[in-house]
Amino acid sequence: LEVKNLIAQGARMLWSQKSVNDGYNAGSAVREDSPKARMARTMDEYVTNMPNVPVLVLGCLVRHREPNPEEGASVYPACQNLLLAARALGYGGVLTGFHGFVEKELRELLKIPQGTAISATITLGKPAGKHGPVRRAPMKELIYGDTWGEGATWAVDPPGTQHTERYIEKKKEK
């Protein structure tokens, strides 16, 4: 519980900064039904309930050389596999960086050795609602061919792909 409370402290610190810096209490977020307001409520609830998450995973990397900006990338595929497996079993998961604000205290509490980087904080549990379909941007807007901004001809969305709202609206405008 002590670790979860510590991560919750980091989560509150990060969310309080982000909510102000990204305008989660101003602009469109003032409207209760706006996507930004819904996201802010979700984050408030997530951060408030952080000490109660059923499973908390710290993705760590044992360093074999000097730290570099790309080193965490070797941990993220494992984190992604964990999240995919959790979803396949009906669980929800979130990859965060909440450990960053309390890393020194975490290291002491968990006796994480020097030379080991904490690269990710992952929470897992049963979702409050149902998993909906995964929505994303069309592949041609994410994968370019020979020229930047020009969708690769082979980047074709699989049948049944659902796109995020802003892409659905774009399609309606055309």
What is the meaning of each model-derived region?
Residues 119-174:
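C-terminal helix-cap and adjacent tail motif
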Residues 1-4, 103, 115:
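Alpha-helix initiation and N-capping motif
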Residues 50-53, 88-89, 117:
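Short gly/pro-enriched beta-turn/loop segments at secondary-structure junctions
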Residues 1-75:
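Glycine/small-residue-rich phosphate/adenosyl-binding loop
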Residues 57-109:
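Small-aliphatic-rich amphipathic alpha-helix that forms the alpha element of a beta-alpha
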Residues 15-26, 110-135:
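A glycine-rich helix N-cap at a beta->alpha junction
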Residues 41-44, 106-109, 129-130:
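Glycine-rich, charged/polar anion/phosphate-binding loops
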Residues 5-12, 84, 120-123:
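Generic alpha-helical structural context detector
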